[in-house]
Amino acid sequence: MEVQLGLGRVYPRPPSKTYRGAFQNLFQSVREVIQNPGPRHPEAASAAPPGASLLLQQQQQQQQQQQQQQQQQQQQQQETSPRQQQQQGEDGSPQAHRRGPTGYLVLDEEQQPSQPQSAPECHPERGCVPEPGAAVAASKGLPQQLPAPPDEDDSAAPSTLSLLGPTFPGLSSCSADLKDILSEASTMQLLQQQQQEAVSEGSSSGRAREASGAPTSSKDNYLGGTSTISDSAKELCKAVSVSMGLGVEALEHLSPGEQLRGDCMYAPLLGVPPAVRPTPCAPLAECKGSLLDDSAGKSTEDTAEYSPFKGGYTKGLEGESLGCSGSAAAGSSGTLELPSTLSLYKSGALDEAAAYQSRDYYNFPLALAGPPPPPPPPHPHARIKLENPLDYGSAWAAAAAQCRYGDLASLHGAGAAGPGSGSPSAAASSSWHTLFTAEEGQLYGPCGGGGGGGGGGGGGGGGGEAGAVAPYGYTRPPQGLAGQEGDFTAPDVWYPGGMVSRVPYPSPTCVKSEMGPWMDSYSGPYGDMRLETARDHVLPIDYYFPPQKTCLICGDEASGCHYGALTCGSCKVFFKRAAEGKQKYLCASRNDCTIDKFRRKNCPSCRLRKCYEAGMTLGARKLKKLGNLKLQEEGEASSTTSPTEETTQKLTVSHIEGYECQPIFLNVLEAIEPGVVCAGHDNNQPDSFAALLSSLNELGERQLVHVVKWAKALPGFRNLHVDDQMAVIQYSWMGLMVFAMGWRSFTNVNSRMLYFAPDLVFNEYRMHKSRMYSQCVRMRHLSQEFGWLQITPQEFLCMKALLLFSIIPVDGLKNQKFFDELRMNYIKELDRIIACKRKNPTSCSRRFYQLTKLLDSVQPIARELHQFTFDLLIKSHMVSVDFPEMMAEIISVQVPKILSGKVKPIYFHTQ
């Protein structure tokens, strides 16, 4: 109660003059109810003033009314005949009776009884407490009869408040607002339970006192035995506080004898078995009071250590158990475990420390390391990543500095063994990753027990045995005989062990910064690109969606390959007129004029000079002329006599040297080579099967657009029939992408991972996660062949162009003759590129054999990928993998022809 401070003394302020808020009036009414309990069986009043004097007057009136009603009941019972009483007892309703605010039966709204009902008999052995009126009737030998309820007095009061009379007597004298609030706040259910418990306890204690002869006070009978007014007041205050959303920290502590309810949200913390569902009201106050109670045998230090969000939280992060000493069962549990149904009441940091302390999402089983331990149980917060060092023994601890894209392909451990590698124990091989099969382990698994210092294998078809047959029909260099990835061409000089960093783009430490001199001649938008920095060349939007190929002369959009260079139509016509004409052009400046789309007509001299620098010649209008020129020279050499044989050889050598000095064909291939394409994969999201495969399909869609543009710019390709052009591209796109990806993996990451795109690099973990591990291993082995054979960029460009013409339908194309001629011309160009670097014919033949064997090895890999993509397209809806429209059309229409045998590849060697 609020007080006023006077000059020299403290005196209470009159309640009638006190100004309070809504909640202050509520609790003031509750306090007045507690201080003035009222009669034993009060009746509900419509309203009560806050003053104490008015409450006393109203209570006296209620007592007088109650006495009058009791007298009327006795008179009616005397007038009622025994036969009518028996009939009323037989016709009584069997349902459970509820007491109203004046002791009447409270019936449901749907039931309208036509006659009064008799109350059920009260049995003391069942724990029932008879009503006072019933006790009077029993003493006189009359059956108990309940009067009919009044019509108007009690109709305004809520029906649920009728249950509060026997247990909380002071509630009847409170205001009507309090009753409405308690009814709306769902506090009645809790008070009903407490009423039943109080009645049962009161009956048992009353019987014990009667047996011992001890007198029973009116206060004990009134509150049900051992309960007191202060205890009931505390329960009511706490129930109202919780139901109104107020804090319960300021309430009084529970007595040491009170027990903790099992349906409390804190009950599992203290070892109490939880109930089916926690109640929202008073149990929280009871549990809170019991947790804050300082009982005997519990120190202050233990009580201070309870709070799970303060001191215990720090200990939980350090790996210690969160102790809770709020009850006697706290010492036995010793661990703070919150139930899963109460996730809204707990902090995420409580279980993250214990769940993530020994968990690493990147301790995945790699192909060249020992078998990992069983994975930890799943966690609801599995999307959170913790990049801790790998902790799988000696072979795994060596990769502690590896990042997310780390690969253990270069680690050499004596105990590392993969499936099918002859591990000493069967348990080691059985605990290998589930995606490994027996065939995959033998064909593509890591080499177990390689010679020298290597236990790591190449992951390809070659095993670790000395007498293994080379799959490509040739002998690899001595440093690659053991199948070790990191042994060829001294990769550590330019490829450190850091692999690819965690950022979605490769870091400068893992990318070969020099592309070679073969890209210097192409000054297009992507020809002078250097992968020295990670984000300089990938952030612009035109990198993800590259524009059309530009003219090498003026930078305008190119219309095709003209006179040996990729140019626009304007520069094509200008070069033809300027080269064939006899007019000489002179520059008015210093021969360094800017030639672009808007200023290309300002200086014809600089424009013509730039055309020659790009490799444009009148003799390169058609690729046939070069072949015909060589055949003509060979025919002339064969028809001449022996004295002129030396002269013919000199002409042939001079022709080859001139061709090497002006590589028209290579200039075209270098100019039309597609740039780097990104997949748009979000590396910040967790790796999943659907995400990886959807990104691969999106990358295939983007690369397919570049393949079409690249094929149309190839010399001689437009001379094919239009249907033949479409068919060749649709049949060979998979092999072209695999071959180009193998080259990128060799040049960027030294064939240790699959470099699909700068933002989509597959390490061992992603290979397993994508469920195409065997195909990925074969593609990685293809990439390793570029290093073992030391493929030059010129050889790669020519082999890639030849790969376009390496698969046709069984029935043939519409213009099969011209297709065969075009394919033969590209084969001759590959032979010329080989002959430019080698003088010995035997060496040239061996090199040609190796390169053609490598081309043949692409076809089986492409067929496996065709089968995989076709099966994935059928199940795409079930596995949530997205397919772009063009990719889905090609896979659904053209791939079945390849799988059914209607379209077959052209092999150089017998398979």
Swiss-Prot record:
Spans annotated as Disordered: 35-164, 192-225
Domain of life: Eukaryota
Positions where Phosphotyrosine occurs in the chain: 222, 266, 306, 345, 356, 361-362, 392, 526, 543, 907
GO biological process, alphabetically ordered: androgen receptor signaling pathway; intracellular receptor signaling pathway; male gonad development; negative regulation of extrinsic apoptotic signaling pathway; nuclear receptor-mediated steroid hormone signaling pathway; positive regulation of cell population proliferation; positive regulation of gene expression; positive regulation of transcription by RNA polymerase II
Presence of the UniProt keyword DNA-binding in the record: yes
Span of zinc fingers (NR C4-type): 551-571, 587-611
Biased composition (Low complexity): 44-88, 192-214
Protein role: Steroid hormone receptors are ligand-activated transcription factors that regulate eukaryotic gene expression and affect cellular proliferation and differentiation in target tissues. Transcription factor activity is modulated by bound coactivator and corepressor proteins like ZBTB7A that recruits NCOR1 and NCOR2 to the androgen response elements/ARE on target genes, negatively regulating androgen receptor signaling and androgen-induced cell proliferation. Transcription activation is also down-regulated by NR0B2. Activated, but not phosphorylated, by HIPK3 and ZIPK/DAPK3.
Name of the protein: Androgen receptor
Organism listed in the record: Pan troglodytes (Chimpanzee)
